[in-house]
Curated annotation (Swiss-Prot):
Family: Belongs to the UPF0502 family.
Highest rank taxon of the organism: Bacteria
One Pfam family named in its UniProt record: DUF480
Name of the protein described by the UniProt record: UPF0502 protein Patl_1161
Lineage start: Bacteria, Pseudomonadati, Pseudomonadota, Gammaproteobacteria, Alteromonadales
Length: 230
């Protein structure tokens, strides 16, 4: 059965999925690290301002659902997910499928082109066709529809896709047949524009990742300093 999440639960699960892959040396995460990652301004839509108490309550809710595991240590309790790809979870995803779900949990509905860029740091996609293939697979995982295609927005070339663990009531699901990844070929000018946009967004994402990494390291230093001065 598909797990149903609240918005804050989706954000916390997305953070744990992301940090497990992108900063494995800091995973599992402390309460402070989870809060910082939930509220970071890069790679998050919408930007949230959760308090540590709100994050702790969310972690407690996820623990009650058996979606996270608490790891007690000499310093502080740390948290890791049991959402997928563990011996305790029924949901098993490929690295590309996991990256897509993670980006959607953290940034909401995405087009295949956006997913190719934004999921690149978690799982490599050499072509947008690979994204579309993974999306089609996620539409039927052991009989569960983890992803749906939304109605195309006016003036947009691509439809967006949304995960189904946390549902935004404003999302309108498309009932049109899925379009094959190679059903149409863009002209040369459109391809050039798309390539330039993708390259620019990739550079921005790389800078955002660097800032996020520095923030995490700063929080870790602050935590160590606090422990030394107690």
């Amino acid at each position: 059965m598909l797990v149903t999440l609240t918005q804050s639960q989706a954000r916390v699960i997305g953070v744990l999925l992301e940090k497990e892959v992108t900063t494995p040396e800091q995973y599992p995460l402390s309460l402070n690290s989870v809060t910082t990652a939930c509220n970071q301004k890069s790679n998050r839509e919408p930007v949230m301002e959760l308090t540590e108490l709100e994050v702790q309550n969310t972690l407690d809710e996820l623990h009650a659902k058996n979606l996270i595991f608490e790891q007690s240590g000499s310093r502080a309790t740390r948290y890791k997910h049991r959402f997928c790809n563990t011996e305790f979870s029924d949901l098993q995803l490929t690295p590309q499928q996991l990256a897509i779900i993670c980006v959607m949990l953290l940034r909401g509905p995405q087009t295949p082109g956006e997913l190719r860029t934004r999921a690149q740091r978690m799982a490599g996609f050499t072509h947008v066709d690979e994204v579309e293939k993974a999306l089609n697979e996620l539409m039927d995982v052991n009989g569960e529809q983890l992803v749906v295609r939304l109605e195309r927005e006016p003036g947009k070339r691509e439809s967006r896709y949304a995960q189904q663990f946390y549902k935004d009531t404003n999302e309108v699901i498309s009932h049109e047949p899925a379009i094959a990844s190679k059903s149409s070929q863009p002209n040369a000018s459109n391809t050039t524009v798309a390539t330039n946009d993708t390259a620019q967004e990739a550079r921005i994402c790389a800078l955002e990742d660097t800032v996020t990494q520095l923030r995490c390291e700063l929080e870790q230093l602050k935590q160590t300093l606090d422990e030394l001065t107690r």
